[in-house]
Amino acid sequence: MSQHTQGRLAGKVLLVTGAGCVGPGWGNGRAVAVRFAEEGAKVFAVDKSAEAMEETLARVRAIPGAQIESHTCDVTQASEVKGMIDACVARFGRVDILVNNVGGSARGGPVDLTEEAWDKQIDFNLKSVFLACKYVLPLMEAQGGGAIVNTASTSGIRWTGAAQVGYASAKAAVIQFSRVVAVEYAKKNIRVNTVIPGQMHTPMVEARLAGQRAGGNVDALLAQRQARIPLGFMGDGRDTANAALFLASDEARFITGAELIVDGGMSVRCD
């Protein structure tokens, strides 16, 4: 990753969910773990799969002086999420920054999508954010403050080329959830913001989305996605991570209840 001024998060503890990837490369959670570690944060990396976090751990441990601990958790289960927060405190003593990054889509409109698939989409993309905030907010309040960055998607604000009503609804709800919590906890020195990635080139695109939307043809899917972006190229997890870093840092001390769209201009097109 590119070189930046070091130490913007020195002494801070980051808890990031969805810190693994389905393959090599820069997923959002992996990039957040690495980028925040580069800036001095101690990283508590969480994913449902320990194997998915192996590259994340290796990349962070390659940074001189970096500290990282991994933890497996099903973030749709309240008891496991509470245990996740407790484990982070046991290891690092506190949680200064929470980045909720778990997410995944399922194709289908209200007729095609099964009720079971709908429930899973809401649990995975929205309930996970609710539970993590539910258990971290009292801790941050007791600590005297903190910063939360929730990851939504341009699917939550625009049509992005495919019917995925469960995913889009959940991500739209994440945006409004963040606004409500931001106002409620502003006087407690807890900032809550949302980063909204667009159609990024991440490991999940190649491993899963190509099969859902382009008959397994990765190049065709990448071409479709890139054609929608005014800047003419797709970003990756590092772009999402840099946006989250700004929102989590003291540089954003006067920003709460806001959304930062990272999509190369895609969402402002009208064609």
Predicted segment positions?
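Short, small/polar-rich loop/turn modules that mediate ligand/substrate recognition or access, typified
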Residues: 186, 191, 255-257
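Substrate-binding pocket helix/loop in short-chain dehydrogenase/reductase
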Residues: 109-110, 114-122, 225
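Residue(s) in the substrate-gating loop at a strand-loop-helix junction
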Residues: 153
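Active-site helix of classical SDR
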Residues: 133, 170, 178
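Short C-terminal tail/terminal secondary-structure segment
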Residues: 2-6, 158, 202, 244-245, ...
